[in-house]
Structures are given as structure tokens and as C-alpha cells.
């Protein structure tokens, strides 16, 4: 299951991010350690130096916004997040089909993140570039994603996915990984659907309604059963 989280960044924040990112140095990303050995063979893009003050500052701003985003919390149940990184595709840049590494070592630390979910936060508007669609293979179809700047998609890190060649303009994005308190993707999906039912029932019937309270209790009991902290 994938989820689109809208307006992680406002349009003003996107413009501010892009004003700084467009002036930055963008080295070839093939040697970057976040890609496994097989993924590097199909990787053809650019990536901002993850240790640069700009990458750290913008990444921290994204994390602060996500910390205030109820939909992200309800869907992901985040336990740990890999610090956001930034990439750019231009002049035919692409990334062939691959799945993300299961375990990711955070640079200059002893922290290891299990990649349960991958996130792409779009920083270019769809009309700024041709191509560059994110394709994600699910059990039943190939999902094609090209979102408005400031919007983000979450998808299972184990799913095969690729970025199609960018033939005009530049596709700029932030990407990172989430380790969830709820490891199983099916359990996360059920919890999210139940959470949405609780929210809708609360609006329709009021928080004091016995049915709403029972639904909320079921949600929290399932979360208690499935979550690791």
C-alpha cells in the first residue's frame, strides 16, 4: 500500500528550498552509500552531499514538518527516520528498477535504520520537467507517480521501483526511509484504514458516541499488540 501525504512543504517553503538547492553543487550520485551495489548499476542521477550544511538544514526542516503531520504519523507510525537526502534528475537522468537496501547505516553514527517505507518528497512541479515519473510495482499493478511540489509519497521499501528518464528540465526531490514501530506492511495498512474510520465516525457521531469509543479502543489494542518501541 502506498500513501500520498499532501503539503508536507508549503509552496513558499518549496520556493525557498529550490532557491537554495538550485545554487548548490550536485555531484554524481553513483558512488553514494545509500544505494546498494546492484542499485548503483542502474543509478544515473545527482545527489547533494549529505554532510553539507544545506542538506542537513533542509533535512531537519522536513523532519520538523513531518513531526507535526498527523497523516504521516497515522500511516507510518515512525520509530526512526533516515535523515532526508536530496537528488536531481536532468539531461536523461534516470534510476532503473531496484529495491532499497533493507538496513541503512546513518553516516558518522552507529545508528542502523531498517527500511520499512521509502519516501519521495517532490520539490519540482510536474510541468517543470518531462519524464521523471516514479513507477512502483505493487501486487496488482504498476503505480505511476508524479506529484505536485511539496507533496510526498510513501511506499514499501521492498517494492521494485524506478524513476523514468527526465528528458526536459530538472526533477528535484528529497528522499528518505522510515523504520516503523509496526514492521508488517499489512498491519500498518489495517491500522491506517481503521484510524480513518475512527476519524470519520467521530465527525459523524461525536467523540462521546459508544460506537466511536469502541472503535478507538480496538485501534489502540491492535496498535498495542503490533507495535514495537
Annotated model-derived regions:
Residues 1-85, 190-229:
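Non-heme Fe(II)/2-oxoglutarate
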Residues 70-174, 178-187, 191-192:
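Catalytic core of non-heme Fe(II) oxygenases with the double-stranded beta-helix
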Amino acid at each position: 500500500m502506498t500513501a500520498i501525504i499532501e503539503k508536507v512543504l508549503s509552496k513558499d517553503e518549496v520556493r525557498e528550498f529550490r532557491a537554495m538547492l538550485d545554487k548548490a553543487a550536485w555531484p554524481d550520485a553513483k558512488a553514494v552509500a545509500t544505494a546498494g551495489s546492484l542499485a548503483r548499476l542502474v543509478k544515473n542521477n545527482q545527489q547533494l552531499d549529505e554532510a553539507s550544511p544545506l542538506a542537513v538544514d533542509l533535512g531537519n526542516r522536513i523532519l520538523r514538518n513531518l513531526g507535526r503531520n498527523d497523516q504521516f504519523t497515522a500511516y507510518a507510525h515512525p520509530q526512526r527516520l533516515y535523515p532526508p537526502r536530496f537528488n536531481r534528475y536532468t539531461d536523461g537522468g534516470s534510476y532503473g528498477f531496484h529495491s532499497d537496501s533493507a538496513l541503512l547505516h546513518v553516516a558518522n553514527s552507529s545508528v542502523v535504520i531498517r527500511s520499512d517505507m521509502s519516501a519521495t518528497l517532490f520539490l519540482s512541479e510536474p510541468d517543470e520537467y518531462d519524464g521523471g515519473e516514479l513507477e512502483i510495482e505493487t501486487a496488482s499493478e504498476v503505480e505511476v507517480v508524479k506529484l505536485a511540489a511539496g507533496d510526498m509519497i510513501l511506499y514499501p521499501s521492498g517494492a521494485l521501483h524506478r524513476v523514468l528518464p527526465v528528458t526536459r528540465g530538472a526533477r528535484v526531490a528529497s528522499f528518505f526511509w522510515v523504520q516503523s514501530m509496526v514492521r508488517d506492511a499489512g498491519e500498518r495498512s489495517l491500522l491506517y484504514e481503521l484510524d480513518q474510520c475512527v476519524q470519520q465516525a467521530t465527525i459523524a457521531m461525536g467523540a462521546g458516541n459508544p460506537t466511536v469509543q469502541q472503535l478507538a479502543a480496538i485501534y489502540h489494542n491492535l496498535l498495542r499488540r503490533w507495535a514495537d518501541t
